[in-house]
């Protein structure tokens, strides 16, 4: 279980999923409110994140990406050490997905942060990044991640995260089962 209350929550989720364990996470307001404010301006950085071809290497790269985004820097990345798509995986079995899913996660995360300039990430944005992390944990085209997302009962964005044709614009949301957390028994009208 990971409360999304720290920038490290995203890379911790990635590492745990890559080790083959499912992750429950909370984007309840009481957790997300502990995140720092996203910088008001972004600029391209000359910093290059070098991604090592390992579970800790991928998680570390995401940690570095998120840390830089919080200070308004958009780094470049070097994925040349990552095994190509289709290469055999000896320890976990199956075939490598290559660097494309990780690069897509980086680009997705950059866009989410750019949409949150000067404020904290919303619970739905944190949820979407966590789901996109789950999307990366695919080996040889086979989903290897399981997620459950907990949110507040009165969070309308999370309540409607899978309403309508959500899969067209937010396909990453398919990676998590969504539920609510509450301290006391809610009134029946809440669900009507």
Q: Positions of the model-derived regions?
A:
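Extended catalytic cores of very large enzyme megasubunits
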Residues: 1-192
């Amino acid at each position: 279980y990971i409360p999304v209350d720290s920038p490290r929550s995203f890379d911790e989720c990635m590492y745990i999923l890559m080790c083959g364990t499912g992750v429950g996470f909370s984007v309840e307001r009481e957790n997300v409110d502990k995140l720092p404010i996203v910088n008001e301006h972004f600029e391209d950085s000359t910093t290059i994140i070098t991604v090592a071809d390992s579970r800790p290497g991928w998680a570390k790269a995401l940690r570095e990406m998120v840390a830089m985004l919080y200070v308004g820097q958009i780094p470049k990345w070097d994925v040349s050490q990552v095994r190509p798509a289709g290469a055999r995986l000896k320890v976990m079995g199956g075939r490598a997905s290559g660097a494309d899913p990780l690069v897509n996660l980086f680009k997705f995360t950059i866009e989410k942060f750019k949409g949150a300039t000067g404020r904290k990430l919303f619970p739905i944005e944190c949820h979407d990044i966590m789901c996109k992390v789950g999307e990366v944990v695919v080996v040889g085209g086979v989903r290897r991640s399981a997620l459950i997302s907990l949110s507040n009962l009165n969070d309308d964005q999370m309540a409607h995260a899978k309403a309508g044709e959500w899969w067209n614009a937010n396909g990453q949301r398919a990676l998590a089962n969504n539920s609510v957390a509450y301290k006391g028994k809610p009134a029946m009208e809440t669900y009507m």
